Amino acid sequence: MTTTPISNVRNFSIVAHIDHGKSTLADRLIQTTGGLQDREMKEQVLDSMDIERERGITIKAQTVRLRYKAKDGKDYILNLMDTPGHVDFAYEVSRCLAACEGALLVVDASQGVEAQTLANVYQAIDNNLEIVPVLNKVDLPAAEPDQVKQQIEDVIGIDASEAIMVSAKTGIGIPDVLEAIVTRLPPPKGDRDATLKALLVDSWYDVYLGVVVLVRVVDGVLKKGDRIRMMGTNAAYDVERVGVFTPKMVNVDELGPGEVGFITAAIKEVADTRVGDTITDDRKPITEMLPGFKPAIPVVFCGLFPVDADDFETLRGAMGKLRLNDASFSFEMETSAALGFGFRCGFLGLLHLEIIQERLSREFNLNLIATAPSVIYKMHLTDGQEIEIHNPIDMPDVVKIAEIEEPWIEATIMTPDDYLGAVLKLCQERRGTQKELTYVGSRAMAKYELPLNEVVFDFYDRLKSVSKGYASFDYHLTDYKAADLVKMQILVNNEPVDALSMLVHRSRAEGRGRAMVEKMKELIPPHMFQIPIQAAIGGKVIARETVRALRKDVTAKCYGGDITRKRKLLEKQKEGKKKMRQFGKVDIPQEAFIAALKVDS
């Protein structure tokens, strides 16, 4: 394979909102440049997980090296980085963008700019990327290219007069996209003779090769047999193979400056290769890392318990396997009196949580219960200590707490005008404060500050339902603020159920508690004695429902006769029930847990 001069290399990524067609566009580019034969083409080539293909989302970043002969007769190498579009994976997006010099901004011509498009475009602009707007789905009858062009200029502030019209599905305009990549995007810069410096873009686990690391070489040359060092973890490895994806893995002799490819080096765990790390030569390392590296920090936590206690070991193995491929997912063992043994898991966000849960049930056939998601709270104690907790069970005694702080986010919500009222009302209900509200054509863009605690529960589902699915939402963490939070417990027959305790804002506690006890009342079957179900904060009960007892008609065999005879039997029954209530155990069915945790606040 002859080395291509650096001026003929182009690294670009595709930035788009979910469902605007970037994976389909990637398919067309691969097909047009002959990366795969027609028989090997399938929908969304780059989305390798079934779940990615089904939900139409990209989770792990992927890359492809395409060879393209341009109209000027030169051969170019185009490295396409397919980035995830969802907010939970924003850090992966930022690393992908750091490895590129340009980006294609794909906007659906029938839907216009959405919230996540904005977030990703701003990241691209921050990384000084050249941006080429592409309007997709122009073949749809609902497409309004001129309005969307105007919208791109108004909202994002980049010139869209030369936006390329394409339909990725039918293949219209694909050659124009390839030409634009070559003519409008800059080549990478890099010094071949300098010391090796490369960016670790992503990594995943392969059963045969160990960890496969995706790299973008900035300076120097990376070849087989080199001894490399990861600067973030300070571990050294010997490179075993170097290659590129065309999307198939193809071995090459070396990767020069500006090139993107993969290496394997007998690395055991993905956790050893942190996304955004800098790779250098072990013999003569560079002194400073590439900017922007930060370890993945979980934001949302929840407990996962197997419905069948015998599945615990299977669950442990399954989580270990997922952890091989996803370093941002963390877990530790936890026990619950109500649910038995399970794990407390940390995720990047709600989509990440859903995906992990779905993969556990789908790939490993596990039946799971998830407890209510929670976030990390900071507790300032009266003795001057500061602790962080994410499990309501670990909360110290109320008298010891001086102040509780919770994380806040800044959310950007784009919605059609008609649903704006409902969306603003939802944000207000969730203790949000409005920062700004702007209009672009018939769409409104609202910026809100919201507590993350209110968002993790079911905010996204509610937002979709109040806006008939049209609103889009994107957020990033800002800081911690003091809050009046209380620990609410659910008591069944005067016994606290640990799996249902949660930290809520005092103003929302009664509503949330009442909804939960009502739901539990419907689902706990009647026992031989009456069962009180209570929601309590500390010693104060804020809501109560009672499941009535089943009782036998003890007076059935008395015909007529004296009332005292009947009374004696009823009193005797009453005594028995009282005794039962002291010693009886209540069986709470799994459905009751699941329903109580799904309660719509």
UniProtKB/Swiss-Prot annotation:
GO biological process: positive regulation of translation
Subcellular location: Cell inner membrane
Entry's Gene Ontology cellular component terms: plasma membrane
The protein's name: Elongation factor 4
Entry EC no(s): 3.6.5.n1
InterPro entries: EF-4, EFG_III/V, EFG_V-like, EFTu-like_2, G_TR_CS, LepA_C_sf, LepA_CTD, LepA_IV
Source organism: Afipia carboxidovorans (strain ATCC 49405 / DSM 1227 / KCTC 32145 / OM5) (Oligotropha carboxidovorans)
Domain of life: Bacteria
Residue ranges annotated for the tr-type G domain, each copy included: 7-189
Gene3D superfamilies, A to Z: 3.30.70.240, Elongation factor 4, C-terminal domain, Elongation Factor G (Translational Gtpase), domain 3, P-loop containing nucleotide triphosphate hydrolases, Translation factors
